Design a protein with these regions (language model features):
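Anion-binding and metal-coordination hotspots
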Residues: 1-193
Length: 193
């Protein structure tokens, strides 16, 4: 797999996790050998448990690497309660004065059934208040979960080999993360009482 923006290739796996924005619990996981995330959005949605998708509308926020119009369109057709919010290009961190005071539409735009997912359609989703609200949660939801797994739990490399074994080990790591997170949520709930 190509490592970062360098010319180096390393033999490694790409770990995927779907994290709930409200609880920060990991609700779906799987490893892959694909070097980038371009073809992963459908698999990621399918890794989310059916109980989560059945009970409410699911918004999936993903960074630029996941954007593939055809795959997003296919995913949304197969999973009608799922709406993908995905950046189409890298955007700088700073905002201009015009961008700060720009009036954005409040809700996601209406889309006709059967219409192809294009870069422009995804940009239109992101240029709404709801789209920006959902997308802004991405970096404060998924990144902390991976940070806790790596820094707090000390998980940096796999002990097993092979995609199936890596999947089992990754599931074990995310289960232990979820148990720790549920304990924290329980403590917070008791403190509020």
């Amino acid at each position: 797999m190509k490592f970062g923006n360098s010319r180096n290739f390393e033999q490694c796996y790409n770990l995927q996790a779907a994290v709930d924005t409200d609880t920060m619990l990991i609700v779906g996981t799987y490893p892959t050998r694909n070097c980038n995330d371009k073809m992963e959005i459908k698999k990621c949605v399918e890794s989310i448990s059916e109980e989560v998708k059945r009970n409410k509308k699911v918004f999936v926020c993903a960074d630029t690497g996941y954007f593939s119009g055809d795959l997003i369109e296919k995913t949304e057709k197969e999973h009608p309660k799922v709406k993908v919010i995905c950046a189409t290009e890298r955007v700088g961190h700073g905002r201009t004065v015009e961008q700060i005071f720009e009036k954005l539409p409040a809700e996601l735009p209406e889309e006709k059934a059967g219409e192809a997912m294009t870069t422009e359609k995804m940009r239109a989703r992101l240029r709404t208040g709801k789209g920006q609200e959902i997308y802004s949660k991405r970096k404060t939801t998924v990144e902390p979960a991976f940070g806790i797994i790596k820094r707090v739990m000390g998980f940096r490399q796999f002990l097993m080999r092979g995609l199936e074994n890596i999947g089992i080990e990754w599931d074990s790591v995310t289960i232990s993360y979820n148990l720790s997170r549920m304990h924290s949520l329980k403590s917070l709930a008791l403190a509020k009482e």
